[in-house]
Amino acid sequence: MIEISKLLESDLETAKSLTDTEGWGNSSEDWNRLFKISLPIGAYDGDKLVGVTTAFDYGSIGMIGNVLVSEEYRGKDVGTKLVTEAMRRLESCSTVRVHSTMESASFYKKIGFMAEGMSTLFRLDADMKEFQPFAIDSDDNIVPAGRHLDEILRMDKRQFGGDRSEYIKDLVSYLPECAFVALDDNNIVKGFIVAKGESNWYEVGPWVVEPG
């Protein structure tokens, strides 16, 4: 019988192996971060981890991610049980969102989610010796993000609508050489970009700018 419960820290490497099978690129560090800043949920067949998801409580906004079920357990409502539990844990949020591939869109619609928009994943292959730390242009208004952390957090809350401060602070601290802000002529932060990753793989985001 499948039981849904909090993901055990001892099963983080198993969770990584699940996402590895799909080529999602989640590193061990990513899973350690997710365990720390999200509400990690596991589907267990006895002591065996067969599915995972992560729920993020950002105050008024909740986010569900990393929904994945081991191939031999698919088609048995395990994914539905995981998402249902994530929604239960985010019931204090006024809105819950989930990022989905086109192949999985029908699954979320059956649960009750509505399509809100579409996104596209972009990929950049580069010589990693040149790619880390990220090179920036010579404009003096592009500066490291660490000195402007409070401004970044206020701006993100305005634009995102929820409070992602712990997540963003963790990313800036973990990879400061890949975190930048754009300043206007009055040295006011107008945008920021952060990234996560290690070795030969990086994912850019959140990437937020003020309108205009």
For every predicted segment, state its role.
Residues 10, 17-29, 155-165:
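Helix-loop element at the rim of GNAT/NAT acetyltransferase active sites that forms part
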